[in-house]
């Protein structure tokens, strides 16, 4: 983890605004082989959606030796279930091209988001 990220992450975990999900191997000496996070974002309500929290899924990663086993999907499903349990109706993420199919199978669709780096 990047050192300057630690204080940011610790604050959000303590506030309950960041949830982490990990998958470990079985056995006496388990290893974390996959994980991801859910950032709960304060969001302005609109006439289309009065909900004031959105979920942003980030840092989904699977160790190379454990890929192609559905672990990224399981991590993402855990994030989505956490959203549902909190009544959150919108979840977003940014996907690597290689992972796009995983998210599309879960119902994610491309949007019209644009970005400008300042």
Residue ranges: model-predicted function:
Residues 36-46, 50:
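A conserved beta-strand-loop-helix scaffold within acyl/acetyltransferase catalytic domains
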Residues 91-102, 117-118:
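Conserved beta-strand-loop-alpha-helix junction that forms the acyl-donor binding cleft
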Residues 66, 70-78:
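Conserved acetyl-CoA pyrophosphate-binding loop and the N-cap/start of the following alpha-helix
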């Amino acid at each position: 983890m990047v050192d300057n990220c630690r204080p940011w992450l610790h604050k959000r975990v303590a506030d309950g605004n960041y949830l982490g999900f990990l998958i470990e191997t079985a056995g006496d000496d388990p290893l974390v082989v996959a994980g991801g996070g859910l950032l709960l974002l304060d969001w302005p309500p609109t006439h289309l959606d009065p909900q004031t929290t959105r979920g942003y899924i980030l840092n989904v990663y699977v160790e190379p030796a454990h890929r192609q086993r559905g672990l990224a999907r399981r991590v993402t499903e855990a994030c989505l279930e956490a959203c549902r349990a909190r009544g959150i109706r919108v979840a977003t993420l940014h996907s690597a091209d290689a992972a796009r199919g995983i998210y599309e199978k879960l119902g994610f669709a491309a949007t019209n988001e644009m970005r400008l780096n300042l």
